[in-house]
Amino acid sequence: MAEIQFSKGVAETVVPEVRLSKSKNGQSGMAKFYFLEPTILAKESTDDITGMYLIDDEGEIITREVKGKFINGRPTAIEATVILNSQPEWDRFMRFMERYGAENGLGFSKSE
């Protein structure tokens, strides 16, 4: 089991686009998530966005760096950033993404 939540206990069903970057020394990195039309922004949803929670069998990774994107005053997307400050954090994040990707049909490709 691997899922993403914006409000504790409410799984996000929209699969994001994820972009990874790593520092030149390989010790730190960043993951940017982009959710187009996420269910948490649906008109019917009354849940507050309290962060982004990446939850799997090992536990959870939490970020509070979550931003809404608006078009014509209407919320349309969420962009969230996870900062990875060490190799163990990077490794943990990649294990989560392997599980999440396998369950949600995400693939991994390196940029040119």
Curated annotation (Swiss-Prot):
One BP term from GO: photosynthesis
One Pfam family of this chain: Psb28
Major localization class: membrane
Top-level taxon of the source organism: Bacteria
Protein topology in the membrane: Peripheral membrane protein
Subcellular location: Cellular thylakoid membrane
UniProt keyword annotations, A-Z: Membrane, Photosynthesis, Photosystem II, Thylakoid
Keyword Nucleotide-binding: no
GO cellular component, as recorded: photosystem II oxygen evolving complex; plasma membrane-derived thylakoid membrane; plasma membrane-derived thylakoid photosystem II
Family named by the database record: Belongs to the Psb28 family.
Subunit and interaction comment: Part of the photosystem II complex.
Xref: NCBIfam families: PS_II_psb28
Protein's UniProt name: Photosystem II reaction center Psb28 protein
Organism of this sequence: Synechocystis sp. (strain ATCC 27184 / PCC 6803 / Kazusa)
